[in-house]
Amino acid sequence: MIMPAKVGIIVVSDDIICALSVNKFLESGNFAPKLLKVMKSLIKFWKSTSLVLKILIGMVVGVVLGLTLPEWSFVALLGKVFVGALKAMAPVLVAVLVAGAIAKAGSGLGVRFRTVIFFYLATTLVAAMVAVVASYVFPVQMTLSEATEGSAPGGLSDVFSKMVHDMVGNPIQSVANANYIGVLFWSIVVGLALKHKAGAQTIEVVSDLAEVVGTVIRWIIEFAPLGILGLVFSSVSESGLYIFTDYGKLLALLVGCMLFTSLVVNPLIIALYLRANPYPIVWVCLKESAVNAFFTRSSAANIPMNMSLCKRLKVDTDFYSVSIPLGCTINMNGAAVTITVMTLAVCHSLGIAVSLPAALLLSLICTLGACGSSGVAGGSLLLIPMACSLFGINNDIAMQAVAVGFIIGVVQDSVETALNSSGDALFTIVADLHSKGKKPADIADLLSGEGKNRC
């Protein structure tokens, strides 16, 4: 009887001591000023810290919460809200920016547009060739067992037929459904009409509307760290780390090809074009664009990030407001790698010998198919059966490769989107620099000046 009594007294005494301490602290009158001081310090730190560092902090917190408290499903809501907000505003931003840019466009944009379109298509083809070579050097097989249900395009004609259909679809529905092919087409048409018929005041209203939408986008981007926190938490809590062991070789080949394209192939092409060290631009685009695209897994959601980066680097608004959304549609380096590697993995698994001419034809088909993947539900993965048909592989077997793609999609799709979307900004900036006679090193001055202005 004595022990419980003593324990009870000790517990009560501890509670009383804690209560007295709290009351004494509150009565001292120092609580509010100290709390206010802490809050001001946190706000000052938040404002002075770069967005990239904030995102990295969000990533770390997301990983920790995902591993330790996976049952906190409400955290994932932060990511869904962030991506949803970006996806909701991005089509509107593209529509008003493109229409306004075309309406105000002067001379000198033609050369840059030709340059950036060449980069988009050429690098996508080279990425497919890199994937072919890597698949020959490091052949990977996958276990093909059960058939997978799903629908995929029957061929290139189906892909481009859908693209044309989407292009001339209802413009309001195109904005509502984030159909960027339709948004681009109708925005260009409206912009041309404004250029020839509208007065200066009307065009200025469109420009003001673009500024308003851009302001809303910037507000959304300020919440990127919380959004990334939610996205990382969702991936870690749902998928864990098992995807690095199952299908590890296939995933390593895919990621390796994409990293090689991003860090070696694209910089080499830019170096030959600019005759200068390309890596100052490459690193900026990877840091400012690829990181966010990796976690949002949506090129469309990353359009505002790319436009914000181009604006900070003094790229002409008339140029980037069209080239960035266009790149979201046809710049598909990562998609070309995915389609090529997965198709050749199926061939290796079935013992199908792929000749060099067939491999080159596959590269071309994957390039054309990848450029249309933004118009296909499921993206690059559902274009795998189309490429497999080149080797006489039936749809049931090819769809099993699609299923494998969805299993490793947490990483594959993230890296693919990062490569695709950061390339949009990269080639836009390169084309603009070349037209102005500047070099990649010049962007360091712009960013350093921006940092001084923030301070």
Language model features by range: what are they?
Residues 42-71, 83-89, 114-280, 441-446, ...:
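Signature of multi-pass transmembrane helix bundles
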Residues 76, 80-84, 111, 173, ...:
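Short amphipathic alpha-helical coupling elements at transmembrane boundaries
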Residues 85, 121-125, 129, 255-259, ...:
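Hydrophobic transmembrane alpha-helical segments of multi-pass transport and channel proteins
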Residues 102-111, 196-200, 239, 275-278, ...:
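Juxtamembrane helix-boundary/capping and inter-helix hinge elements in multi-pass membrane proteins
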Residues 110-115, 215-222, 312-328, 356-357, ...:
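Membrane-interface alpha-helices at helix entry/exit sites of multi-pass transporters
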Residues 288-370, 441-451:
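Helix-loop-helix junctions within the multi-pass membrane cores of secondary transporters/permeases
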Residues 341-455:
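Transmembrane alpha-helical segments and their short flanking loops
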